[in-house]
Amino acid sequence: MATVLRHQGPEIPQNITSKVSFFRSQLILFNSRRKHGLLYSLATAGGLFCVPGVLGVIASETEIDLLIERTVPLPFITLMITVGMFVLNDLVDVELDRTSSKKRPIPSGLVSKRQAWTFIILTNGAAVGMLLIRLDLVSIMLVLPMILIGIIYSMTKIALMKRFLLKNIAIAIFYMLCGILGMTSSYGTGLVINNPIVLLHMIAISGIMIFVGSIVNDLGDTEGDREAGRRTIPVVLGGENTIKMLIILLVIMPAISWMLYSTSAEHAYHAISMTAPIGVTIVASLALVRMTSIQKVFEDRDSMRKQHKKWFPLYMVLQSCHVIAALLPL
């Protein structure tokens, strides 16, 4: 009987295979929360340019390497912290996400819990590393609370994500800190100190918007949150009352913007351009139109998750309004 000889290629060492698997797992985890990371990172990037006069200060910088060092790392710090903390939340919520049929890497088994922990440590470690290289006291004072909020949001014993109002307030504060991190860069700190009303306008409007959006997300998870014993706003107030509250907040948002604009005009320093309240009014109006659709489907989990995804462009438009208002004073 003839013997058939088959050519066998070189065996791939097991450690190389494991490395490929590891890097792939990290990429999967990053991509799973990339959209949220970019949203919060853009809040920081927008903050760099939403202070009137900051472009002139940046343009006066003669050392390009110093300009890059003082601005570029900030959005990346926010990006790393955000994706890391969202994955931490996914890790804690793995059983709930599995029962809710959410297609995320950890509950679906695409990545292991160990790989998720590695991702969390690496992303936050990278953020802290960039922060230490900059050695800017103001940035440190803003980033450390961001990390702390991310931890206690998911930490089992405290778990802000389970607590009535505190969950959404924590998300709003985190988002506001992202914007402040950009506004108080080395080039914007002095301008913010001289015109604090600009800072107040940004954190008030952005805070309300992200607060409303986070509750819209909770509306899609009402059943799962109720079964898990979480006291989210929709669980406590009910869907209809929650939507009424969101509509009131969206109406208040442009009112606050116009009030702050009028205040700055009365004091004759026009810290806020009229472009800002006009833009905020447009965004709030679009959000109210979106709320009419939400009223019809808030009891349907899958439809609500789609509605929350449609909320993301509104965040982007609002960030653009802050920047445009600084660049085009009226």
Predicted regions located by residue number:
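Multi-pass alpha-helical membrane architecture of UbiA-family
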Residues: 1-330
